[in-house]
Curated annotation (Swiss-Prot):
Motif 'KMSKS' region: chain residues: 725-729
HAMAP family recorded: Leu_tRNA_synth_B
Localisation: Cytoplasm
Protein's name according to its UniProt entry: Leucine--tRNA ligase
Amino acid sequence: MTEPATTPTTPDEQIPRHRYNADLAGQIERAWQETWSDRGTFNVANPVGSLAPTDGSDVPADKMFVQDMFPYPSGDGLHVGHPLGYIATDVYARYYRMLGRNVLHALGFDAFGLPAEQYAVQTGTHPRTRTEANIVNFRRQLGRLGLGHDTRRSFSTTDVDYYKWTQWIFLQIYNAWFDRDQNKARRISELVEEFESGKRTLDDGRNWADLSKGERADVIDGYRLVYRADSMVNWCPGLGTVLANEEVTSEGRSDRGNFPVFRKRLRQWMMRITAYSDRLLEDLDVLDWPEKVKTMQRNWIGRSTGASVLFATAADDIEVFTTRPDTLFGATYLVLAPEHDLVDTLVTDAWPDGTDERWTYGAATPREAVAAYRTDIAAKSDLERQENKTKTGVFLGAYATNPADGKQVPIFIADYVLAGYGTGAIMAVPGGDQRDWDFAKEFGLPIIEVVTGGDISEAAYAGDGTMVNSGFLDGMDVASAKEAIIARLEADGRGKRRVEYKLRDWLFARQRYWGEPFPIVYDADGRAHPLPESALPVELPDVPDYSPVLFDPDDADSEPSPPLNKATEWVHVELDLGDGLQSYTRDTNVMPQWAGSSWYELRYTDPHNPDEMCAKENEAYWMGPRPDEHGPEDPGGVDLYVGGVEHAVLHLLYSRFWHKVLYDLGYVSSREPYRRLVNQGYIQAFAYTDSRGTYVPAAEVIERDGKFFWPGPDGEIEVNQEFGKIGKSLKNSVSPDEICDNYGADTLRVYEMSMGPLEASRPWATKDVVGAHRFLQRVWRVVIDETSGNVRVVEHEALSDETLRLLHRTIEGVREDYAALRNNTAAAKLIEYTNHLTKEGVAARAAIEPLVLMVAPLAPHLAEELWKRLGHDTSLAHGPFPEADPQYLVEDTIEFPVQVNGKVRGKIVVAADADKAALEAAALADEKVQAFLAGATPKKVIVVPGRLVNLVV
């Protein structure tokens, strides 16, 4: 809605000449931003390299590394929701800088990705042109906010000097394998040495020395942390690219563009993140992260303990994984994922006699039924398949043998079983699993009770109980039955104990243009070869156009063709990779957008290093473990990382994985990238929709008689009001430029920090911004005479006891609040103190200078200006920050509630050191208490020290 955004409310001639208003704020802010830039106020030194102290001095031991989740530079620029986290981290960094800490705070840009590429496709403009223009605008907008960044350390993931090291890290991971005995990554060269020495033998019994060069390469490729696999992927013909599971909506459509997505088997680059499942889980315990985020990661990794069980068939054994092997006697059918490798082998040519018609999918033969079913589910996402309440499936015409009792059970395919989880096959126990129960009811399959405690005629029962109908397990409890059946399966060679995970390996290729090229080439036989580090960076070539080949969105049979295929001269190269000059073909996929953000914290520590990702000394200084400060289990990492909870799983999981590989290989000393994480909330605002549910510009909506109207192109219409996250999609954005123009950046900073706790979402109301502005005007008036512009502070005015106590309580409280990111309560304390100074007319320097210093993290431009006018010739950016005098933190008096028979009837104020007798006397003397006593003498007086007095009548 349109709201007034101007500060003055009186005619210009009545406004004091030196009032703090938008114009003066703008002048002050521009001047101090220029001063900070010229002086390098926020530049911070490294132990070694180009950013080391030029005088040879050591860097301070007391450091602080603060980091924001860096922005994607969209063409729309910032809205007021974006700076929330940036301002909060700036307040935090400024506070610790004033305490004397060596603070690293910088901001780069996560600039690869689909939006810039789509714009390039539409306009023919190179994505870099659009991206760099967007970055210029972002830097301009962010610069207005007065963020204390070391701008020398800024970069974009699209900078060649940056993605050279993204490619380098890819090669380190590619040239590594995970040694399960040592529970860590090791270099491929060490694996080769073990095979050559005989220390390690091949699982299939072959002799390493007898293998050809190609066979050895195949063996090694099977160990690599980066590998190619024929895997089920999410193919989006409408975008011309493969999508990760996380980029597909629950409706089976692309998150961007809303195109249909199909499950398809393609050869793709994968990263073996699953090798780190246990370490990714275990190290969550040593991180100072929100429990919600830890839970999300634990659930995503999804560790479960159970058993693998082999069911014999006429073709081959079917391996299933189950967390409830105790229920094996209740398995009445098997279900395979429709994509399971054995489906085409097991399916029969004709239906067995007496096949239930419900099992046939309406087809004449099992093969026809399987083909039809696969076609019908091709567009479903994994999430949609698992959440689908209507159970569908097809009988393969084949049976398997239950190893527990030797009975034959039918084999089905169904979409609720996923190829990517476990073995892609389940033993269905309808008495113990609700999805199996629903399927059994739908298809008329037996339901057997194997654990007492439920009513399987009504629903499955998955709880504990006593085993029944389970042969030798009968009478056991569930835990004992699990151990007994696993022992039997292992003895019979039909199963074994096993741990399984929901986490899948990371699909690491995209059929796009605007991303990091792979440092991989293929020889004439199609074998992949990593490029030597000397060949980095592999730069993106220019292409005639930037779009992948797009297909009919519904064409599930289409095949991806990346846009880099069009750069034919770049694709075909002559290289000497150790066997003489040969012809090779470059990989034409690009890395996913997650790649650049999976390691950027490291580059902040050493952004100009041409020879290393980062020098070990710099990483160890900024990110190394500090057990003396953080405890013996400190994993190291960035001291504070702030960003949205929407990145709780993907970005944070991927960056943890990369960091752990680099740790294992000895490149970093920290075993985690981010020691502490805080998720900021969203800024929300009213949005408005027309009768069709289409959003209309909130700024154009008018409120009249409790209703809302929009003056659309066809005349005014009534619209509906709702509340949501501020942003482009809801058409309720407010630009920070607008607020800076009308009030100043310091006002925006104070307003956003005052709106509520950082972690909570909060409502935006432009009309309320003036409150923050008026607070800063009061701070200004405490120091500056608005009429003359002179400093009104006096040197030796004595402070009253009340002012002294409030001052030092404010100092103590603000210090605690800033350290805990409670900027809203810090602002409240500063407002209270400022109001006191104004009301009492306090002009003493001893009372006012601490206020200016305490305001500095929130409103740095104003504070710097006032500090200078108070006669200081150095910036306050590096302190000092006021310290509270303990003698003024002790209360002289304490208020106690007084109860009569357990109900509060009055309050007394007594000396802080009053004894029990004094408390009792004061309580009995209180007029309100006397009225309730009505002359009666209490039978008992109970004094709870520090809390209350209770009179029992």
